[in-house]
Amino acid sequence: MARYLGPKLKLSRREGTDLFLKSGVRAIDSKCKIDTAPGQHGARKPRLSDYGSQLREKQKVRRIYGILERQFRNYYKEANRLKGNTGENLLVLLEGRLDNVVYRMGFATTRAEARQLVSHKAIVVNGRVVNIPSFQVSVNDVVAIREKSKKQARIKASLELAEQREKPTWLEVDSAKMEGVFKRVPERSDLSADINEHLIVELYSK
């Protein structure tokens, strides 16, 4: 399955909420009709069944993090193997992806842009270049912009925009040095309350 490259706002309208696939700073313009699904009959919102609600929640989270279906299912299997709450484990695994950490640290305006930085070898972890977006960052890992990439205008612009976003408490970022530390694993209370991971667990538990 190919990665979605179409209009980002269409995905947000499909899920009925801002997925922050654009800049991650400003809310989507009211003219974009976020509460109306795309298409000719978007205004008609059929009542979802339990399965429909579970599926929509899974699609929403998958799109937020930019994960393909097969990869998302593998994350769920891994979360289920770990001790503790499966749903929370799933979110922690997704938050620990290198592309997500790069985005959270403010080096990119979107996760898609962060994924591109990683793939183009602009990111180092503990001094070594890592070009795998799904690389799992561990506690105390130092994530930084590669020296030769620090002059990129888009990275500097992203750091400026990041000042307008709420800074994650589980990360420590030095914007001047363009590096950050993954201080701790995020707790559920640190993450979006707009995600209902229990619905995803119910979906995959069937």
UniProtKB/Swiss-Prot annotation:
Q: Does the keyword Signal apply?
A: no
A biological process (GO) of this protein is: ribosomal small subunit biogenesis
List the Pfam families hit by this protein, alphabetically. Ribosomal_S4, S4
Q: Which GO terms describe its molecular function?
A: rRNA binding; structural constituent of ribosome
Q: Which GO terms describe its cellular component?
A: small ribosomal subunit
The record places domain S4 RNA-binding at 96-156
The answer on whether this UniProt entry bears the keyword Endoplasmic reticulum reads no
First and last residue of the signal peptide: none
Alphabetized, the UniProt keywords read:
Ribonucleoprotein, Ribosomal protein, RNA-binding, rRNA-binding
Annotated family: Belongs to the universal ribosomal protein uS4 family.
Subunit annotation: Part of the 30S ribosomal subunit. Contacts protein S5. The interaction surface between S4 and S5 is involved in control of translational fidelity.
Against HAMAP family, the record matches this protein to: Ribosomal_uS4_B
Summarizing the function annotation, the protein's role is: One of the primary rRNA binding proteins, it binds directly to 16S rRNA where it nucleates assembly of the body of the 30S subunit.
Under what name is this protein listed? Small ribosomal subunit protein uS4
Q: Which organism is it from?
A: Haemophilus influenzae (strain ATCC 51907 / DSM 11121 / KW20 / Rd)
What taxonomic lineage is listed for the species of origin?
Bacteria, Pseudomonadati, Pseudomonadota, Gammaproteobacteria, Pasteurellales
